[in-house]
């Protein structure tokens, strides 16, 4: 069967779920055609805000319910998000992100903070076996990029605006 989620979001799920065994198996394809990423905001609200953009591509989902495997190349357009901890809202160049079992691979994706004289790029991997156990292994290169944009109301210990140029390595769990 094919169904649409939230009206015109253009997400079609096709395939089979075999629940005639003790561990149901999946053999599905999620077809996204300019799927509105704001749909996922509720799932990542602890880390990201203002999630936006469109996703297009096919995501193959297979395996048992306790061991789900997925893979696909997803084209991202007009992607943007706010890092809640830093208060900075970034927009990203259109790109293709490769997804496979627990990994999203970023390959030199351009990033901007909304000002005309800033730019950067990000490469690496985001690990997410489950949404509650995300991790990152990223390299971010910045040229006058905003890194912090908070007020004392946001964080009493440290706040303000910080702009930076250089290379930032981030590795570890997101919590």
What positions do the PLM features span?
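Interface amphipathic segments
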Residues: 1-58, 66-167, 173-175
């Amino acid at each position: 069967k094919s169904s649409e989620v939230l009206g015109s979001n253009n997400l079609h799920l096709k395939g089979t779920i075999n629940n005639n065994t003790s561990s149901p198996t999946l053999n599905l394809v999620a077809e996204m055609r300019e799927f509105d990423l704001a749909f996922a905001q509720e799932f990542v609200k602890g880390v990201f805000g203002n999630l936006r953009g469109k996703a297009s591509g096919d995501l193959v989902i297979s395996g048992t319910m306790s061991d789900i495997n997925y893979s696909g190349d997803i084209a991202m357009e007009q992607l943007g998000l706010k890092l809640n901890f830093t208060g900075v809202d970034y927009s990203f160049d259109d790109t293709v992100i490769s997804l496979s079992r627990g990994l999203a691979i970023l390959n030199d994706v351009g990033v901007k903070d909304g000002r005309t004289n800033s730019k950067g790029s990000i490469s690496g991997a985001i690990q997410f076996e489950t949404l509650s156990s995300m991790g990152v292994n990223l390299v971010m290169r910045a040229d006058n990029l905003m890194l912090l944009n908070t007020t004392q109301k946001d964080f009493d210990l440290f706040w303000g605006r910080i702009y930076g140029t250089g290379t930032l390595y981030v590795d570890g769990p997101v919590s």
